[in-house]
Amino acid sequence: MSELPGDVRAFLREHPSLRLQTDARKVRCILTGHELPCRLPELQVYTRGKKYQRLVRASPAFDYAEFEPHIVPSTKNPHQLFCKLTLRHINKCPEHVLRHTQGRRYQRALCKYEECQKQGVEYVPACLVHRRRRREDQMDGDGPRPREAFWEPTSSDEGGAASDDSMTDLYPPELFTRKDLGSTEDGDGTDDFLTDKEDEKAKPPREKATDEGRRETTVYRGLVQKRGKKQLGSLKKKFKSHHRKPKSFSSCKQPG
């Protein structure tokens, strides 16, 4: 402290929230946790800020002991505080402490703590209660779960149903000819289907083509042949017109 200039030492005395670090090169604000270079211009600019002015008015001499025994110094990190009600770490600065203590979680935990003190019951933080419930649920759910019934197709033998290989339900009944073509519906016909050879035998013989039908077919063929010849002739003409030999270059020259 004696190594600092007189104006810097006087300025730090006016602002007790600014603490000089051990290396005497930086200044730390206990209200916001900011670190500043130990120079008078930077310190003056910082103290004129709105945030610093608001915190100074709210807590001119901030005392962390007011929030004990609920908020105590952290054993893991000396620059942080620990809340026993919510089991959370807080930065060691008034702004963060005030924000935490004014929050819903802390206020709810504080009310629960006061109720437990009146009833003479030990207070257990809410997060620990949730953890215990999860562990109990996991312990209860460790047993083997009943497996769902595996789906099995119904057997084809039940109720005299047709086998799965039968494909009669996929095609119309007209495609399957029966052996008892000549028998009536009341007759004792069998349900077996005809084979390919039997199907050909069962078909009626084709009628012979008449003379008139033959004449019509010959006339039709003649017309088709004539049309084909006409089309070929027109195509040949077009091909010749497009593939004519170019005139020789000498014939294009004008006589001298």
Curated annotation (Swiss-Prot):
Stretches with biased composition (Acidic residues): 183-193
Keywords linked to the UniProt accession: Phosphoprotein
Record field: compositional bias (Basic residues): 224-247
Highest taxon above the source species: Eukaryota
Region span, Disordered: 133-256
InterPro entries: Surf2 (IPR008833)
Ranges of biased composition (kind: Low complexity): 156-165
Signal peptide positions on this chain: none
Record carries keyword Transport: no
Species: Homo sapiens
Biased amino acid composition, Basic and acidic residues: 135-150, 194-218
UniProt-listed Pfam families: SURF2
A single cellular component GO annotation: nucleolus
Modified residues (Phosphothreonine): T190, T195
Family classification: Belongs to the SURF2 family.
Protein name: Surfeit locus protein 2
